[in-house]
Each structure stands twice: as C-alpha cells, then as structure tokens.
C-alpha cells in the first residue's frame, strides 16, 4: 500500500517470528512515453507546400512502433510505423511499403530535412520534416528504450492473451 512517499508492505509471520511491516521508499515515477510536436510541410506540385501540424509519439509499451498523428481538417489521421524505419531514413532511403523515409536533398530552404512518403488506397502524400526535429524525437525515444532492448519492454503474457482471445 502506498502511504505518503513510501510503500508499506505487510510481511507474513515466519515460524518463530512476529508479523512485521516494512517501509520501502516509493520509486520515482518513470516516464514511459515521448511526444514531440513537429511542423511538417505537405509537398505540392506548385508553391512551397502546405503546413501540416503533427506529433510523433513513442511509448515503452509498444517499443517497436512510432505513432505519427497528423492534425488538420475535421479529424486527426494516425499512421503507425517502425522506429527503425525512421532512424534508417535519416541517412538513406528506407521502407518498401506504405511508409517510406529518406533524406531530403531538394528542400526549398536548404535545411536538412527528412521526406516521409505515405501511401494508402485513399491516396499518397509526401511530407517534409526538419531533420533536427526527427533526431530530437529519436534521441528521446532511444533514451526511454535503447535500440536492441525493445523485448525487455514487451508484456508477452498480455500479447499472448490478446492473440488467443
């Protein structure tokens, strides 16, 4: 039971010993999610493109995935893709499916940018993001769950229960 800033834990009596209670300091709350707002630019055939407000979300409970939420119009649109895909796309073209990421060398402002290509049955979109925003997001996500340690954050019992239910 949490009491103040410590846990009180009742211990069962062991033969020859009395019932005791032990105070254990409460662990500080550990952040398990990363959210970063990013300004994207939707590429168009003419002009500088259209601004698209978005956010990137990463959670330790889904350690392989990034959730990109694009805000605009009447509803938000969410795409989920691999964190490794975003990381690999910073230095070379990555992805062969609905989401592709690559460095952007033809940005009108000349700043390092990342191109995100999204394809669905409803249409395609090319979005540019500042490389610095993407790197900042990945640094924070990697600090939360270092690359290669994702399996330590998976609840396999819960996953199996969802698969069989």
Curated annotation (Swiss-Prot):
Chief place where the protein resides: other
Pfam families: SsgA (PF04686)
An annotated GO BP: division septum assembly
Keyword field contains Cytoplasm: no
InterPro entries given in the database record: SsgB, SsgB_sf
Keyword Ion transport: no
Disordered as annotated region, ranges: 1-21
Compartments where located: Cell septum
GO CC, alphabetical: cell septum
Family to which this protein belongs: Belongs to the SsgA family.
Name of this chain's protein: Sporulation-specific cell division protein SsgB
Organism whose genome encodes this protein: Kineococcus radiotolerans (strain ATCC BAA-149 / DSM 14245 / SRS30216)
